[in-house]
């Protein structure tokens, strides 16, 4: 049988390609997710719960709060499990809105399947309760292709869609001293300067200033002092050309190479096995001389019959020699 090698090359124009909205590359300072956590009990397990004393003692104390006296020793039935409970609360969430919840076993429970999380307060980093979680725990479906051991491994982690109710809004201020700050998701000095320039051009006045590679400070115009929401929505829709550093990403296991369409290379002569390629005066010397980029080099190597492993090895050597003008990320 003929062995076929599949070589995947993905060319991504990472440098100066098109425009994107500010809302796609940045967030307003102060408007961020917050992590919540708590410790709770999952009940209703069919003998797959914890076997330890801690869980039964906790359940006995919970019953005591409802004036029900139960000996903790009588609760060692493995029908409950002590769990950590997690949720992320997005910005602007108000009381009564719902959050997705994740639960994970703390003890020696075998499975949380079929269990029910008893009402559990969820705390923020400041120690205050911001949400309460409760509901049926889902551990996902059964995959006949996966071994029983692997199935059991992931049945001690569960999920409760919309399982928590927000009880307290997390306070924040994103307008300070009549100004707001936007933070780039990927810091870059060039992009930061372009964002400030684009905002100033859109509003026809100098209200934005790039503070550093990640933050741009914007003064709120007097016309919008009583309508901040409209002003922020206009800022979000401003389009800007994004600049990204040159990068080549290779995956040795799959033979995948991802690189920007304009990643440049310096002059060099390559001799690798039966392959010989020369880059001179910024051109790849082949049947048709083309500009010296990673894209043109890879195309030339493919035409010579290079395998994915050959090309990855050549790129790594070029990076070590300093002729590849990009960061090389090997996965």
UniProtKB/Swiss-Prot annotation:
Designated name of the protein: Flagellar P-ring protein
Signal peptide: 1-22
GO BP of this protein: bacterial-type flagellum-dependent cell motility
Chief place where the protein resides: periplasm
Domain of life, per lineage: Bacteria
Cross-referenced HAMAP family: FlgI
A Gene Ontology cellular-component term: outer membrane-bounded periplasmic space
Stated role: Assembles around the rod to form the L-ring and probably protects the motor/basal body from shearing forces during rotation.
Coiled coil spans: none
Keywords of this entry: Bacterial flagellum, Periplasm, Signal
Organism of derivation: Pseudothermotoga lettingae (strain ATCC BAA-301 / DSM 14385 / NBRC 107922 / TMO) (Thermotoga lettingae)
A GO molecular-function descriptor: structural molecule activity
Compartments (UniProt record): Periplasm; Bacterial flagellum basal body
Record keyword Isomerase present: no
